[in-house]
A protein has these predicted regions:
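Structural micro-motif
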Residues: 38-46
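Non-catalytic, surface beta->alpha helical segment in thiol-disulfide oxidoreductase systems
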Residues: 47-73
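Local sequence-structure signature of Cys/Sec-based thiol-disulfide redox active-site neighborhoods
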Residues: 1-28
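Non-catalytic interaction surface on structured domains
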Residues: 14-18, 43, 58-62
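Active-site loop/turn elements of alpha/beta-hydrolase fold enzymes
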Residues: 31
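A near-ubiquitous, low-amplitude feature marking generic local secondary-structure context
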Residues: 2, 45-48
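Amphipathic, hydrophobic secondary-structure cores in small proteins
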Residues: 34-36
Length: 73
């Protein structure tokens, strides 16, 4: 799992905090150019096994994934 964020991005901060709280191992790249290189314009960008989730969808996806993980699924 790789989190791409940019400085000053409130949604990026929220997602990073959720990922840290869940104790998930992930790579964090804080670089707006790296986000653009992915072909997306929104931050945060969360890359999971080739799928890219961006903006609020990244937070929603991670929240649901973390909940399933906590329930043993």
């Amino acid at each position: 799992m790789t989190l791409y964020s940019k400085p000053g991005c409130p949604q990026c901060k929220v997602l990073k905090m959720k990922m840290d709280k869940a104790g998930v191992a992930y790579n964090h790249i804080e670089d707006e150019d790296a986000i653009i290189a992915l072909g997306v314009k929104a931050a945060p960008a969360l890359v999971v096994e080739g799928a890219i989730y961006t903006g609020p969808d990244a937070i929603k996806w991670f929240t649901a994934w973390a909940k399933e993980r906590a329930n043993g699924n």
